[in-house]
């Protein structure tokens, strides 16, 4: 059961789609419950490049994101429309849905990707005072980072909470360099909020004229607004592309850049996930053996290690530090093959099939 608009540019929708595909691929019947939101004129399975299809049930009443009272009503009607008496297992990210499933004693897995601070008062009351996460109907609680696990163990959960970092579903392929490129293609994929470091990429591109920069993400309007103040020709903007097109675009990139700021906002440019983030795109970069240049945020150290599988920038607010590393890479990218290979091997082993198998193992 998912609350997310689908298909859409939201990472949560992509992760849910790929999870359902993997469960279907290993032989289980899947019914995904969704609100009637998202880019409904586009084919869901084509948008996410899904080969192993599954049933989708849309609740027509909810033609916009379920909020307020509709948040609670959506959970209730989702379970009702799922033919709950015949379902063996549920998976959800929604606290209230988990609460209702526990009330009717339906076994389920609860995935947590965010801090509880973004939830409403009633949900906080359910978790902190009623201890709903300790209910026996929850077979497993999964967080995407150790920092998030530590946050929730404060509410008394110990035995059934595990960490499963996000994982990529892309085909694994590592680019080989037979000679050093004259110009590096440096790429960013994702939201173009300032917290994701778009201003830093623009600033770097203006100074570093020897390389090309590519930004994939945001709406056409957002891109037009940004380009008004840019005159250099070595930076290229493209609006959000469907996941089915990511592999091809990413294959042409040499260095993937993630210049996060100390505060990382989410959809709507709100909140702060800098302590708990596990970016899905990071694992896509690794799966294709890309050299990753990233801000050194503590939470990312759960997966990224400086000069082992990535290059991490400590003083990430200073463009000179980024330029210094880019200059070193430009001199000889082959020198970084060992770092790229380490990232590639990790993502190849810990792919979305591996993650799904761990999720469903009891």
What does each of the following model-derived ranges do?
Residues 215-217, 224-255, 265, 307:
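Nucleotide-activated donor-binding/catalytic signature segment of Leloir-type glycosyltransferases, i.e.
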Residues 2-10, 22-73, 147-153, 163, ...:
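N-terminal strand-loop element at the rim of the active site
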Residues 171, 317, 321, 331-362:
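A charged, aromatic-enriched C-terminal amphipathic alpha-helix characteristic of glycosyltransferases
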Residues 1, 142, 168, 179-196, ...:
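Conserved donor-binding/catalytic core segment of Leloir-type glycosyltransferases
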Residues 40-49, 53, 57-90, 96-104, ...:
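An amphipathic, basic-hydrophobic alpha-helix
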Residues 8, 196, 242-250, 256-287, ...:
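Nucleotide-sugar-dependent
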Residues 34, 113, 131-132, 136-174:
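Donor nucleotide-sugar binding/catalytic pocket of nucleotide-sugar-dependent glycosyltransferases
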